[in-house]
């Protein structure tokens, strides 16, 4: 049986990890062994458990303890604390209405190397400085649905384990293998692994998405840039190809998550 602890005051320190710790504080780079992330909703929590993530505590509405949370709690150590409170207290937590009544603090798993993530992968996505957690989450969902085998990210971008990113991804950040790229010339590391690199950018010499050189590549990395400015000139210069999405009505760009969906469908799913 879960160790249920009822909270009566929003200022209770037991709620600090859920209500007052920032995402950066949870990451705890000074002490990685104690770094945490928060998973929201039964679906996301379940997928995190499927991926082997270790729960530390739960926060949920009282009815979920014996309701839709019972199956999840049954998969966990019965001595884990399960905090609960009235809806009046819980709704003081910013965004609680988006959590479907259930949150879980979990330990951050150690990240694999780029080579480990890419082992056996034919199509991967690379995110250079994508800053918005919503975009990162949406891209992971597209990657899972549209044939991407892995996602690599630069360290300056948003963390896939941020609450909003994992929620928007519908838990797909726990299904698609991912890790961070090394500092410096990471395109060289991808070339060493046998990947053809395709930079999504509007240039005069850009290839169309359906170019045979892209479709026939044995291993292809689709490289997407930050919101607004897109990829850096240095990254574009270091990639094998520059690729564009043909558009009409004078539109010259898409949101990065929308561009990812189009590119993944053509270069991922269609090439399987």
Label for each model-derived stretch:
Residues 85-86, 128, 154-155, 177, ...:
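Short beta->alpha connector loops at strand-helix junctions that form conserved
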Residues 1-71, 157-158:
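Boundary-proximal intrinsically disordered activation/regulatory segments immediately upstream
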Residues 4-10, 81-86, 176-186, 243:
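Short acidic-hydrophobic, aromatic-tinged amphipathic segments that line or gate anion-handling sites
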Residues 67-79, 235:
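Short, aromatic/basic amphipathic alpha-helical patches
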Residues 5, 107-205:
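RNA substrate-binding interface of SAM-dependent RNA methyltransferases
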Residues 198-251:
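Active-site/ligand-binding-proximal alpha/beta "capping" segment
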Residues 75-95:
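A glycine-rich helix N-cap at a beta->alpha junction
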Residues 102-104, 142-146, 157-172, 233-272:
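Structured adenosyl-cofactor binding patch, chiefly the S-adenosyl-L-methionine
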């Amino acid at each position: 049986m879960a160790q249920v602890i009822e909270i009566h005051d929003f200022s209770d320190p037991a709620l600090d990890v859920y209500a007052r710790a920032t995402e950066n504080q949870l990451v705890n780079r000074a002490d990685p062994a104690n770094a945490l992330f928060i998973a929201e909703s039964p679906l996301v929590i379940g997928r995190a458990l499927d991926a082997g993530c270790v729960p530390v505590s739960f926060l949920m509405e009282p009815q979920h303890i014996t309701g839709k949370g019972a199956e999840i709690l049954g998969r966990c150590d019965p001595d884990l604390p399960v905090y609960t409170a009235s809806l009046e207290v819980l709704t003081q937590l910013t965004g609680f209405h988006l959590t479907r009544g259930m949150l879980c603090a979990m330990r951050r798993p150690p990240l694999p190397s780029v080579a480990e993530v890419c082992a056996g992968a034919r199509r991967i996505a690379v995110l250079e400085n994508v800053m918005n957690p919503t975009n990162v989450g949406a891209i992971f969902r597209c990657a899972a649905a549209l044939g991407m085998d892995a996602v690599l990210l630069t360290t300056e971008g948003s963390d896939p384990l941020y609450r909003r990113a994992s929620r928007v991804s519908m838990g797909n950040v726990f299904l698609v293998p991912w890790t961070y790229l090394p500092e410096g010339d990471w395109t060289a590391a991808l070339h060493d692994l046998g990947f053809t690199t395709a930079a999504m950018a509007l240039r005069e010499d850009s290839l169309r998405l359906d170019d045979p050189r892209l479709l026939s590549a044995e291993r292809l990395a689709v490289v997407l840039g930050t919101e607004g400015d897109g990829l850096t000139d240095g990254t574009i210069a270091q990639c094998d190809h520059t690729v564009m999405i043909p558009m009409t009505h004078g539109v010259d760009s898409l949101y990065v998550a929308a561009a990812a969906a189009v590119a993944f469908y053509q270069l991922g799913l269609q090439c399987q």
